[in-house]
Amino acid sequence: MSTLSGGLRTLSYEAFLYFYPLVTMDVTRLQAFNSPIGTTPGSGPPNRFSHMRAFPTADFRAVVRPNFDTLYSSAWLDLTAGPVRLTAPDTEDRYYMLPCLDMWTDVFANPGKRTTGTGAGEWVIVGPGHHGELPAGLDVITAPTPYVWIIGRTQTNGIADYPAEHAVQDGYTITPLGAEPEHAVDSNYDLKTEPLKIVNGMAALDYFDYATDLLSVNPPHPTDFSQLARIAALGIEAGKPFDASRFSADERGQIEAGKADALAAMLASLPTLGTSVNGWTVMTDNIGVYGNSYFKRAVVTLVGLGANQPEDAVYPLLNVVADGDPATGDHDYVIHFDADKLPPADAFWSVTMYDAEGFQVANELDRFAIGDRDSLTYDADGSLNLYLQHTNPGVERESNWLPAPLGPLGVTMRLYAPKAEVLDGRWHPPVVQKA
């Protein structure tokens, strides 16, 4: 290995980034497979949905920046024993989507209102290389990997809408067309540590050993040849065991340093992950499907595993207000939308308030988000003001009030099925002004 020592750090850096989504997805999958049913979305045996039946409460801490627009229906597919049939009910024009992610975090299919409409739907999902008879008359979706994560979302119009929402969720079904895959629970698997902490805490050589095993099960994308050819110098090749003993102590140090470099670079890139405009960061390209942008794919895994394609949802994040300072609950703010500049979405839009850690905070209205499905008050000219502040602005403005906690604020706008002007950059969220 001495002839490669000078490049080991760089190769380790590249390999860590390349495999980061795959390893993180597998840890997430195994936590779900080994968790009791209903513990987390998607938990329990494969090939069945687990539904979130209500919005998160004020003390919910399972995930950061939860949404209050849709309820989740999550499932992990195991296609190793054969295809499955996926069904969705007639949602009667209700917005829904069932994005299917491969183990590299690419959304390879997304049945739902935007793509297939809201009538009842049926699809067969097959694993890579499948050969065999399939039911006639059904659309076939070929998964790039034998394991698939479906992160379904269904529009919810407040608590009173839950019964109708639950009826739609109950209409999502997964039926194996062959034998049930084997499912043995590992009672010793770590279910308490979040997947990112597990992955980031792995020693580099253990990480690459794990990644090599996964590569033998989950085919790389067809355009990955060049990257795989480079990292083969580390001994990472599908179908071959990874031999960590071949490296000297110095080489091990360089490999570990490459992993550390990769993590540091990912964290350093966060402020520039999207386009910064009017104090907001907006990502409208190269997300959900990444091609050969391995660095972007890894960073999105770090900050938003399971991200949608921008055609389905865009999430502007507030960084600073008009004076260039971050928003805090010590000040009152206004988001003003001109009548012709309201958030352009074919489905719906919202603004959600979090604290600095990305969690909702209890308030007198039990309101954590506000949007176009709420009873908002518009000005006579059709424009709209949203009031972001800690104290109640009074009865005349309460309908447009998004309560804010004290301290640093985390504000996220969500546009579902955004229109073309969002995706091509003609529309931007407005500058947030101090009141």
Question: What is each PLM-predicted segment?
Answer:
Residues 1-435:
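A compositional/structural signature for long, glycine/proline-rich flexible linkers
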